[in-house]
A protein has these predicted regions:
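Short, glycine-rich nucleotide/cofactor-binding loops
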Residues: 3-19, 43-50
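A generic structural motif
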Residues: 30-35, 66
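Mid-chain, well-packed structural core segment of small domains
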Residues: 56-108
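C-terminal binding/interaction regions
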Residues: 117
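Charged helix-capping and loop-helix junction motifs
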Residues: 20-22, 51-56
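Histidine-anchored nucleotide/phosphate-binding helix
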Residues: 14-32
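Internal active-site segments that recognize and position negatively charged phosphoryl groups
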Residues: 121-125
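A short beta-strand-loop structural module common to alpha/beta enzyme folds
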Residues: 33-44
Length: 125
């Protein structure tokens, strides 16, 4: 089974990702293949450069070919992207100040990125 995660609820990255999902991925015991992870709202803060969670996740994502994407509008609002609100959803916003491998985008970019690695289910946390 192949799944992407959408981290949309309060503290999803600081609790569910960092204490459950990430350790399981690091140990190779998580189960399904992870196609990607999409981060919304304050959940993107876990991906800031030098954040321990983000740095660990960046390493795992590179090893396991996991897409890491932040909501472009969420990143612009938090000064973690280069671009304007008018560019959101177009693919023109670039992630900035985040760990290696993170891209910024909206649903069109997410769908395009996952098209070559189509998931079976989507899990929103």
């Amino acid at each position: 089974m192949k799944v992407p995660y959408a981290f949309a609820t309060n503290m999803a990255t600081t609790f569910k990702l960092s204490t459950m999902i990430l350790p399981q991925l690091e140990q190779g015991i998580h189960g399904p293949q992870i196609a990607g992870m999409m981060f919304f709202d304050d959940n993107i803060f876990a991906l800031r450069k030098n954040d321990p969670i983000g740095e660990r996740l960046s390493k795992v994502a590179k090893e396991q070919n996991i897409l890491l994407m932040v909501c472009d509008q969420c990143a612009v609002r938090r000064d973690l992207a280069e671009g304007t609100f008018e560019q959101c959803g177009t693919g023109q916003v670039k992630a900035s100040g985040l760990v290696d491998g993170v891209v910024a985008g909206c649903f069109p970019q997410l769908y395009e990125a996952l098209a070559g690695n189509m998931p079976d289910q989507v899990i929103t946390l």
